[in-house]
């Protein structure tokens, strides 16, 4: 494939280190310079710089956010300066590149269509996907992929994610993370994923989550969120996602949190309680107290003396049509043995 992430990353970090070492003994860099260095290292941009993604051979869609980490920081060419990446064919455009070709099996990337087609035909992940199966239903399979074992795969996945999550910054310390990737059962094409920090002092059960554009509006986000809480439940911890959430992430979480709270209060363990505390709700749902409070406010179901109005919950359920299908995850398909 045309680009090696490790080469691009090394080129970027070495240039940053060179600038820092070259300034040793001089005045400290200004806040503006520090900001520029941060943008170079994490690829943070205020506007889109790649117009569209060719994802596999037959999927094409626009990017949502810009990212500089695909490019040499000085030439703005794809990869490091010694490669022959092409600038955007659109002159005087905001875009550094018109089309980025991304393998839908392994997320390796190039700006050369011929090389891309050749890679896709022989990509090993087309025939053997990485990771270990942790959930397998007739519809969907979730695999755990360790960043320490599949470093390049996970780095390329994180790079791709930066084009669709505005708060996704880290992409190179993947050995500290596990990635839970969802596939259609029987397929080798990833549809989305969430990552989990292995050394989270806040005991977060999710670092970031993304369903890839071609597979959105299928309920896969709710499936992965529910799975992340199932992992926490098996670990015996009250947990939740890393904050801040992206705007789309917050929408997904509020829907899941609303469903789980409604179920426990209307049909579940707390249905016959005259009074419940925030701690009760936290224990039975696995949600953090702050997330419980946020969701109850979102449901607009808190009345005088902090009473919970069940009619408000039933109204929400009627509006969203979720009462007949409370959960997407089925325990009988879990394969969690470690």
Swiss-Prot record:
It is found in: Cytoplasm; Nucleus. InterPro entries: Acyl_CoA_acyltransferase, HAT_MYST-type, MYST_HAT, WH-like_DNA-bd_sf. Histone acetyltransferase (HAT) subunit of the SAS complex, a multiprotein complex that acetylates 'Lys-16' of histone H4 and 'Lys-14' of histone H3. The SAS complex is however unable to acetylate nucleosomal histones. The complex is involved in transcriptional silencing at telomeres and at HML locus. Also involved in rDNA silencing and G0 control. Residues 1-15 have a biased composition (Polar residues). Pfam families: MOZ_SAS. Autoacetylation at Lys-168 is required for proper function. Residues 45-338 form the MYST-type HAT domain. Disruption phenotype: Heterochromatin spreading downstream of the silent mating-type locus HMR. It comes from Saccharomyces cerevisiae (strain ATCC 204508 / S288c). Residues 1-31 are annotated as: Disordered. It catalyses: L-lysyl-[protein] + acetyl-CoA = N(6)-acetyl-L-lysyl-[protein] + CoA + H(+). This is Histone acetyltransferase SAS2. Gene3D superfamilies: 3.40.630.30, N-acetyl transferase-like, Winged helix-like DNA-binding domain superfamily/Winged helix DNA-binding domain. Belongs to the MYST (SAS/MOZ) family. Keywords: Acetylation, Acyltransferase, Chromatin regulator, Cytoplasm, Metal-binding, Nucleus, Repressor, Transcription, Transcription regulation, Transferase, Zinc, Zinc-finger. The active site is at residue 242. GO terms for molecular function: acetyltransferase activity; histone acetyltransferase activity; histone H4K16 acetyltransferase activity; zinc ion binding. One of its GO terms (cellular component) is cytoplasm. The keyword Transferase applies. The modification N6-acetyllysine is found at residue 168. Residues 16-31 have a biased composition (Basic residues). GO terms for biological process: regulation of DNA-templated transcription; silent mating-type cassette heterochromatin formation; subtelomeric heterochromatin formation. It is an enzyme of class 2 (transferase). Acetyl-CoA binds at residues 209-211, 216-222, 246, 323. Its EC number is 2.3.1.48. A zinc finger (C2HC MYST-type) spans 100-126.
């Amino acid at each position: 494939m045309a680009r090696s992430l490790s080469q691009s990353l090394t080129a970027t970090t070495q240039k940053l280190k060179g600038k820092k070492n070259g300034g040793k003994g001089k005045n400290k860099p200004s806040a503006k310079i520090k900001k520029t260095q941060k943008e170079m290292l994490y690829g943070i941009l205020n506007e889109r710089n790649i117009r569209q993604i060719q994802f596999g051979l037959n999927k094409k869609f626009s990017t949502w956010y810009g990212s500089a980490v695909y490019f040499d920081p000085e030439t703005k060419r794809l990869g490091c300066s010694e490669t022959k990446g092409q600038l955007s064919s659109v002159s005087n455009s905001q875009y550094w590149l018109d089309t980025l070709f991304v393998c839908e099996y392994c997320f390796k990337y190039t700006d050369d269509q011929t090389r891309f087609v050749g890679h896709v035909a022989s990509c090993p992940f087309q025939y053997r996907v990485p990771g270990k199966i942790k959930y397998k239903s007739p519809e969907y399979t979730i695999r755990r992929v360790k960043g320490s074992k599949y470093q390049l795969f996970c780095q390329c996945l994180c790079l791709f994610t930066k084009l669709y999550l505005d708060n996704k910054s880290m992409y190179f310390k993947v050995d500290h993370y596990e990635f839970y990737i969802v596939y259609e059962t029987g397929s080798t094409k990833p549809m989305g994923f969430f990552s989990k920090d292995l050394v989270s002092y806040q005991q977060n059960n999710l670092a970031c989550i993304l369903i890839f554009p071609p597979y959105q509006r299928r309920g896969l986000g709710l499936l992965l969120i529910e799975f992340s809480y199932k992992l926490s439940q098996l670990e015996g911890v009250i947990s939740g996602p890393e904050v801040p959430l992206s705007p789309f992430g917050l929408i997904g979480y509020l829907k899941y949190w609303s469903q789980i709270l409604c179920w426990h209060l209307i049909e579940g363990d707390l249905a016959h309680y005259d009074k419940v505390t925030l701690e009760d709700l936290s224990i039975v749902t696995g949600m953090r107290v702050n997330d419980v409070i946020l969701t109850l406010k979102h449901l607009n179901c808190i009345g005088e003396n902090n009473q919970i109005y069940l009619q408000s919950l039933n109204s929400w359920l009627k509006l969203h049509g979720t009462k007949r299908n409370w959960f997407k995850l089925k325990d009988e398909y879990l394969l969690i043995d470690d």
